[in-house]
Structures are given as structure tokens and as C-alpha cells.
């Protein structure tokens, strides 16, 4: 359902408000470059600093602009189960193809708590759900056994975005539930994950170079592993620089350097340190993206 390349969209700001003009251009560029779908209101989209109203507006705007062109997998997670249900219901109402639900952050629930959180959302709203495991942000790992239990007991939980960084964990999930849609949440691990049965990536770097990320996945799908490996290593330096500071600071800085939108962030995210900015500029020039 959500195979291929999905872009974890940045949320452009101007004067501290969502810049919908720039947003529309970003979405159109993704469509023209051949991605399969977009993911608004995720980690890269600065969802924690969007107001409830903005969160809803961004999701609805993306559905409106992407309709008939590509799928929308909206971020609707929260550390409050009730709030996650609210955003998921909004996504269903406005016509999203599915939702990406991050594990609750800060609360540090047990595995039982995680199971009940996701199951309650799935039982309340009938929409395809992709779990989002990113323990580095949330402080809690969704264990493979919990993923398997949710997949077995909730017909609309169809996949997991894996950003644990552990191929062991990803392999364990696929072993327990071979039919689950296993999606990379880390650009550096897209090719390795594809090789063990993954179906695609929710990419940060595809905000900047969607064509190349699409090429990587399609080349692997065609069976040309040698060429896919070449693309992987070509992209790797840029992938690493996307995390030279906390995401989405680097990717927004790059988007600004390329004239796509402003580099404005909302506190506590802040402007990139100048030495890191210079490293980004050099990498973009080396890659031929900046003169």
C-alpha cells in the first residue's frame, strides 16, 4: 500500500506562520520528481511545534494539493492517545490514504501501554495505520513482539516505519510478521532494509533530491543490485550531512540555500551553526546542486 518513496515533508515557515505558498511548490516538485507519496506532520515537519489548528490545516492542504497525484500518509501521533485519535480522525475525514503514528514520547509507556495505545487508535478509526518506531526521539522502543501482536490483532495496522537503526530489529519484525509493510525511516539504511524485505523509505533527503531516492529504490526493484549499491554510496555523504545537527535543521537549511523556502524554524529548533552550514554548502557544491 505504501511502497516506494515517501517524502517526510518539511513544513515551511515565514514570519513564524506556515508558508502555504512555498508548501504548494514543495508538494508539486515532489509529484513532478516521481515520489509515491508525501508524509506531512512528521518529525521532519516539526509536528511538535505546530498548533492543533495548524496540524489539521497542513494535513488538509496536503490532501488537497496531492489528490489524484500521489498518496498522503499523514503524521497523527501524539504522547496523548486521545490527541492521536483526534488527529487520526481528522486525517480520515479529509481523505488521507493512511496515517503514520509515532510511539508516545516522554511518557515512557511499557510494551503493554504501547500495545493499548496503538490498538485503541486502530479500533477507533478505520484507516490504514503505519506504526512509527524512533526510540532516539521517543525514549521507548516498540519491540518486535509488540509490532507482531498489533499486526495480528488490528486489521488496519499494516506497516511499520523503522527508525531504530537496528537491522537486527528489522529482521526480527520481518521474521515474526512476513506480510507487514516494513518501511525504512533512515535514508542510510534504505538499501539494506530493501534487501531484507523492506518495501521502501520515508525519506528526509528526498525533500532535496527526490529523483535520486526514487532511482535508488527503482533500481533495486529492477534487480540491479550493483547499480543500487553505487547510488547508495553516492548519496551517503549527503545523507550523513542531513543529520549533522538535529533533523530538520540541516534539511531546512539546504532547502533555503536552494531557494525552496526559508530556513525558519520554530524554537526549540534554531538556526544551524555556521561551521556546519559551510559544510553543507561545500557538499551541495560537490554534488552539483549549488554553484
Swiss-Prot record:
Active site per UniProt: 132 (proton donor/acceptor), 161 (schiff-base intermediate with substrate)
GO process annotations (BP): diaminopimelate biosynthetic process; lysine biosynthetic process via diaminopimelate
Sites annotated Part of a proton relay during catalysis: 43, 106
Matching InterPro entries: Aldolase_TIM (IPR013785), DapA (IPR005263), DapA-like (IPR002220), Schiff_base-form_aldolases_CS (IPR020624)
Keyword NAD recorded: no
Pathway noted in the entry: Amino-acid biosynthesis; L-lysine biosynthesis via DAP pathway; (S)-tetrahydrodipicolinate from L-aspartate: step 3/4
Primary subcellular site in the record, as a coarse category: cytoplasm
Assembly and binders: Homotetramer; dimer of dimers.
Protein name: 4-hydroxy-tetrahydrodipicolinate synthase
